[in-house]
Structures are given as C-alpha cells and as structure tokens.
Regions:
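Active-site loop/oxyanion-hole signature of alpha/beta-hydrolase fold enzymes
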Residues: 2-39, 202
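Gly/Ala-rich beta-loop-alpha elbow adjacent to hydrolase catalytic centers
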Residues: 40-44, 48
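Flexible "cap/lid" loop of the alpha/beta hydrolase fold
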Residues: 53, 59-92
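Helix-loop "lid/cap" segments that line or gate small-molecule binding pockets
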Residues: 85-91, 102-113, 131-138
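Conserved serine/cysteine hydrolase catalytic core
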Residues: 125-172
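Catalytic histidine neighborhood in serine/cysteine hydrolases
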Residues: 175-191
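Catalytic histidine-centered segment of alpha/beta-hydrolase-like enzymes
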Residues: 188-201
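C-terminal alpha-helix
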Residues: 203-211
C-alpha cells in the first residue's frame, strides 16, 4: 500500500466544491480501480467527510479525527463565520508566533500543550488566513444527515478521551449509522495523532486491515 499526504498549500481553492472537484478528480485519475482510503484530522477531517459523502464511490474506507460534520442553524453559522473571518484577518496582519501561542490556548485543545512538530518558517500566514475563510465550518455543508444515510465505505471516527465535544459527535454519528465506527483514544485530547501515537496507529491499522481484508 502506498501513502500520499495532501498538501493544501499547493493550490488556492475557492471553496469546498472547488477543493472537492480538484482532489477527487486527482484521486480518480491516480487510483483507477485500486482501493483508496482517506484520512483527515480536524479541518482535514471535515474535508475528508465532504469527499466521503459527495464521492462515496471513490473510497474503500475513511478515517476522520476530531472532525465536525457541520453546523445546523443559521445563527451558529453566522457566529462561526464571524470568528473565522477574524482569525483570517489576524493571520494576515499579526505576528504568527504570538497568534499560535494564543491558538494553542483555545479550549478545543483541552488545556494540553502542543506536542506536534511545528516549523514556524514552513507556515504560510496568507494561506492559513485563506483557509480560515474558504474552509470555515460556516461555509461547510451540514453533513450529519448525509453521514447517517451513508451506506458504502466504512468510516472510522476517532476522538481523544479528554475531547468531550468531539467524542460526543463521534458517539452520535456511530449511533446513527452502522457504517460508522467510533473509537476513543485514552490519554489524548483533540490532537490525538500526536498525543497518543501508539494507540492512534493501532486503531488506524486495525481499521485499514479490516477494510482491505474483508
């Protein structure tokens, strides 16, 4: 099996639809009839969900980590868009070192320090600013109902035990659809792949084996 990491920095996407068309088109060309698995964390997990429900024919399995399926009410969307556009503005205009310190203190990270490797020099403030705008949860479709009716590829939803918000999302999704399995990783918050690597890799490996050997 070969693996390929998607670099969102390589292109400038206009919206979810543009990203989906480009990404799924490339996957379709490259994989032909070979089994394809898709994995994404946080924002990448939201993009993975979008590709999963809109092009279910492409995937043998999907793994999402700490990903939101979408907002329901207009009020939620308005509030989220206001927040994301403010972050977008700040990443365009403020010092990225100080901004990232503030970002790491957000409640979603469960009070845990960032243990992932991060090279500040490799980060592009303009691109990050753009992502906050075009990939805002406010601009994402509400995928919950589509995921509940998902009947093709199995989906593994992973959350950390300390990440109560996303654990509840995973539980609700798994309860609503037999194709969705939810696994809670111990000793981890939102940044599961870095906070408990061994347990994360173990769950992902079991899922991949089950998909490829069914």
């Amino acid at each position: 099996m070969s693996f390929e990491a998607v670099n969102l920095y390589e292109k400038s996407y206009k919206n979810f639809e543009h990203w989906r068309s480009e990404f799924c088109g490339e996957v379709e060309q490259q994989t032909k009839d070979e089994p394809s698995l898709l994995m994404g964390y946080s924002m990448g997990g939201r993009l993975a969900m979008d590709a999963c429900v809109n092009r279910p024919d492409l995937w043998s399995g999907v793994i999402t980590v700490g990903a939101h399926p979408g907002l329901i009410s207009h009020d939620e969307r308005d509030k989220q868009l206001k927040k994301d556009l403010e972050w977008s503005r700040r990443f365009r205009t403020e010092d990225i070192h100080e901004l990232l310190k503030e970002w790491d203190r957000l409640p979603v990270f469960c009070g845990r320090s960032n243990c992932s490797s991060r090279e500040i020099t490799e980060l592009d403030s303009e691109k990050i600013s753009h992502f906050f705008d075009v990939f805002s949860k406010a601009r994402q479709g509400n995928l919950s109902s589509l995921l509940k009716n998902h009947t093709l590829s199995p989906l593994l939803y992973i959350s950390g035990c300390d990440d109560l918000k996303y654990t509840k999302i995973g539980q609700d999704l798994a309860a609503s659809c037999r194709q969705i399995r939810h696994e809670i990783i111990p000793n981890a918050g939102h940044r599961v792949p870095w906070e408990n690597q061994d347990a994360f890799i173990s769950e992902v490996s079991v899922f991949i084996d089950s998909v490829l050997n069914k």
